[in-house]
């Protein structure tokens, strides 16, 4: 696996890249990150990005080998991030337990749903690399951050002094981020706060999270996306929520009342905006995508004709991608047949399997492009893949309504709902891996990696993840169960996205889904598209409609720190542009943000293990709810002071 190459990033004559030890290390990291992501996703509906923590761990371990390289470390983070990202399948599969179709998670069926969708996600996004990674101005915030971590950790920058400064910034900011995150778990400082209040007959609220990771993400995504998300936040929380709560019966618990309406109505409005923005995104990138496919075909012909391509430009052969995609459809068809056989849908195998396979291919290709674009725009960890899951399950359910209608008995309807969830699970695997894949390939491009080797590593990561996820899911189901499932106990895991997606499938197939909010969201999405295009033509700051949709869809506590981070990043970059070495100053800014993300991400893994081992939601809490006000005041002051100190320190190091 070692070959002689001319690596652009380091100029090494011989580079170790796709090695057995790298794959083994990536697999070991996978066990930790995937299990942690599965638990956290079911508990709070969020997962964390694993690329940067995996890169940091890899560099720390492989540093003992004198022949380790930046490209080998890149392979490790690629394997680990693919498996960690695949854990987002928990946003769909627990729905099968919630509706009573499954009692647990059958190992091979769960692994097949997860693995086939993930591998298709890798293959479908191969021809997108040229269009969405090479020939694009998309920022890829996490891809850039991971590349900076690899560069600094490997010492590959020119000039020992610059490397030392960069590593210092990364480590200091990571330690500060970890320290603050630890304090929030003790509850001596608040990690999040929300205030709910009435607005006439309605209600709304203001909430914010004290998260250095989200602050760093805001710096990396930039002012345009940050302001688009702020517009979405304003529309969702300060326009829609007051209007909708004013029309609903009032309740004594203001937070539960308004929060419930946000989840059941405002989020659907946001999903409508995301859907229209996703379609518009697809139309805008259709030309580059077609060009990317043509480039891939041309590259394959050039290689067959004996013309050498630079290693940094070699993808998996397009012929292999096509054959591989067709080959993966075979186990998908077998999987679907096993679901149908002997049940209420028996006798309709041909039409159901054919319809589902066509749906997986067509819809999978569309969302692979859209999810790749989303990753480039705002980063994989902030992409609303659960919104894509909503659109997928609605589309899959409508396909089944078209084939069977709605006048079915209860047993057949339940079987159709389960079938829709399984098809959605495969498509969701395509979405999550496409979202992560292009982010990893951007990292590879920045460090001079070989694309086809990364694509192989991504497939390996998918296989690792698909083998780990089923037993973890089954263990958590046995120990806690899921809220809404038959026989669920008081400690059942909420699994909010799975609950929503399964409810949508039942609503569409049962004929009782309210399309009003999705329709209004779609109409608003068109308006946001027009606004963005007008701003672009006027040369003003653009407001990407997908960013607006995300701002509506996600909680304010997740959006506000990103918005603040984008403003801080804007002012920092304006300062950096006035320096003598603007590029170095900008890179130091990226490392500042990266350190903030790295620290909190690594702590997220550690704390997930503590929570799982202790069985307590707050195993490190030192004070109770009575300390909430001092914790909020003290936490806010400490957060602001640390932010100012860390950015000032970076500026002093830049000089």
What is each residue range found by the language model?
Residues 1-655:
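Alpha-helical multipass membrane-protein architecture
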């Amino acid at each position: 696996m070692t070959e002689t190459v001319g690596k652009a990033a380091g100029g090494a004559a011989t580079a170790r890249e796709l090695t057995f030890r790298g794959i083994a290390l990536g697999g070991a990291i996978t066990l930790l990150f995937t299990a942690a992501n599965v638990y956290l996703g079911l508990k709070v509906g969020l997962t964390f990005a694993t690329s940067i923590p995996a890169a940091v761990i890899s560099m720390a371990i492989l540093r003992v080998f004198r022949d380790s390289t930046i490209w080998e470390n890149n392979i490790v983070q690629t394997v680990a991030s693919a498996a960690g990202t695949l854990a987002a399948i928990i946003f769909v599969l627990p729905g099968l337990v919630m509706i009573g179709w499954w009692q647990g998670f059958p190992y091979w069926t769960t692994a097949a749903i997860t693995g086939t969708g993930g591998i298709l996600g890798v293959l479908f996004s191969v021809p997108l690399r040229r269009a969405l990674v090479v020939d694009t101005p998309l920022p890829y915030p996490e891809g850039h951050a991971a590349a900076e971590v690899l560069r600094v950790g490997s010492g590959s920058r020119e000039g020992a002094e610059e490397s030392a400064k960069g590593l210092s910034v990364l480590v200091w900011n990571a330690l500060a981020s970890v320290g603050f995150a630890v304090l929030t778990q003790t509850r001596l400082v608040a990690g999040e706060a929300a205030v709910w209040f009435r607005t006439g007959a309605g209600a709304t609220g203001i909430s914010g999270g004290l998260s250095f990771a989200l602050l760093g993400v805001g710096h990396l995504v930039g002012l345009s996306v940050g302001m688009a998300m702020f517009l979405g936040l304003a529309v969702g929380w300060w326009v829609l929520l007051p209007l909708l709560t004013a029309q609903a019966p009032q309740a004594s618990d203001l937070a539960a009342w308004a929060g419930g309406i946000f989840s059941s109505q405002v989020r659907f409005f946001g999903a409508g905006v995301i859907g229209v923005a996703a379609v518009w995104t697809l139309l805008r990138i259709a030309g580059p995508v077609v060009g990317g496919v043509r480039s891939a075909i041309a590259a394959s012909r050039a290689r067959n004709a004996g013309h050498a391509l630079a290693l940094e430009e070699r993808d998996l052969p397009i012929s292999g991608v096509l054959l591989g995609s067709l080959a993966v459809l075979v186990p998908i068809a077998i999987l679907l047949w096993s679901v149908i056989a002997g049940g209420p849908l028996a006798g309709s195998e041909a039409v159901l399997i054919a319809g589902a396979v066509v749906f997986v291919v067509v819809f999978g290709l569309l969302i692979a492009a859209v999810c790749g674009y989303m990753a480039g725009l705002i980063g994989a960890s902030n992409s609303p893949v659960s919104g894509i899951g909503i659109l997928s399950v609605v589309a899959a359910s409508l396909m089944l309504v078209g084939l069977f209608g709605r006048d079915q008995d209860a047993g057949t309807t339940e079987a159709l709902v389960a079938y829709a969830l399984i098809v959605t699970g495969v498509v969701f695997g395509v979405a999550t891996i496409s979202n992560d894949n292009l982010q990893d390939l951007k990292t590879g491009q920045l460090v001079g990696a070989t694309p086809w080797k990364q694509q192989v590593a991504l497939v390996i990561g998918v296989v690792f993840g698909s083998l780990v996820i089923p037993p973890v899911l089954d263990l958590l189901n046995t120990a806690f169960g899921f809220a809404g499932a038959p026989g669920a106990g008081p400690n059942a895991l909420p699994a909010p996205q799975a609950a929503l997606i399964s409810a949508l499938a039942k609503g569409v197939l049962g004929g009782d889904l309210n399309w009003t909010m999705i329709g209004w969201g779609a109409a608003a999405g068109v308006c946001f598209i027009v606004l963005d295009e007008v701003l672009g033509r006027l040369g003003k700051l653009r407001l990407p409609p997908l960013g607006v949709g995300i701002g509506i869809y996600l909680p304010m506590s997740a959006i506000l720190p990103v918005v603040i981070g984008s403003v801080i990043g804007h002012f920092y970059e304006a300062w950096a542009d006035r320096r003598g070495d603007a590029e170095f100053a900008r890179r130091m800014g990226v490392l500042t943000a990266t350190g903030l993300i790295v620290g909190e991400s690594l702590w997220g893994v550690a704390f997930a293990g503590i929570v799982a081992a202790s069985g307590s939601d707050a195993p490190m809490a030192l004070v109770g709810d009575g300390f909430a006000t001092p914790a909020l005041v003290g936490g806010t002051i400490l957060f602001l002071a640390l932010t100012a100190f860390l950015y000032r320190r970076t500026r002093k190091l830049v000089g």
